[in-house]
């Protein structure tokens, strides 16, 4: 039987630590990047969501921040390798998009790893231009207009 999965923000200090560790584990460890928390100047002003199982395992995550009054940006999206293609990424994107609408955004941008382009296209995002990431992995800037 599969665990029940809840999409929500981390609540406790312990959950925030697990969330930070998960982001590194999924997004940076495979690139052999040292375990440094993935935090920037927008971290505290951002909206963080995770998919967490009833056994308290984080299996997906994503973050949203506002670039300006009308444009939001998704960053740090990731899904556990053994949980991919189960709809968890879509659930996180839906929650992030709903948050962007609440904040008054008219569009969302993101910089997708090229291996994830088809996923984001399936969510309604359009490729805009190549993006140079600090990870040296090919990325593409994408955008979606909210309705």
Regions found by a protein language model. Name each.
Residues 1-14, 145-147:
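Conserved N-terminal entry element of GNAT/NAT acetyltransferase domains
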Residues 21-54, 58:
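Active-site rim helix/loop that mediates acceptor-substrate recognition in acyltransferases
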Residues 50, 57-65, 73-78:
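Conserved beta-strand in the GNAT
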Residues 109-111, 121, 126-141:
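Conserved catalytic-core motifs of GNAT/GCN5-like acyltransferases
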Residues 79, 85-98:
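Conserved acetyl-CoA-binding loop-helix of GNAT-fold acetyltransferases
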Residues 93, 99-113:
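Conserved GNAT acetyl-CoA-binding A-motif
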Residues 43-45, 70, 134-138:
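Short acidic/glycine-enriched loop/turn segments that link adjacent beta-strands
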């Amino acid at each position: 039987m599969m665990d029940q999965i809840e999409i929500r923000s981390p609540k406790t200090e312990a959950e925030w630590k697990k969330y930070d560790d998960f982001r590194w584990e999924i997004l940076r460890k495979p690139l052999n990047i040292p375990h440094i928390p993935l935090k920037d100047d927008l971290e505290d002003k951002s909206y963080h969501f995770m998919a967490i199982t009833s056994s308290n395992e984080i299996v997906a995550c994503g973050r949203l921040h506002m670039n300006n009054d009308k444009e939001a940006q998704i960053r740090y999206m990731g899904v556990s390798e053994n949980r991919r293609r189960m709809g968890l990424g879509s659930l996180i994107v839906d929650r992030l998009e709903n948050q962007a609408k609440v904040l008054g955004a008219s569009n969302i941008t993101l910089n997708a790893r090229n291996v994830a382009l088809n996923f984001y296209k399936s969510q309604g995002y359009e490729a805009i231009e190549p993006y140079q990431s600090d990870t040296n992995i090919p990325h593409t800037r994408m955008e979606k207009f909210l309705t």
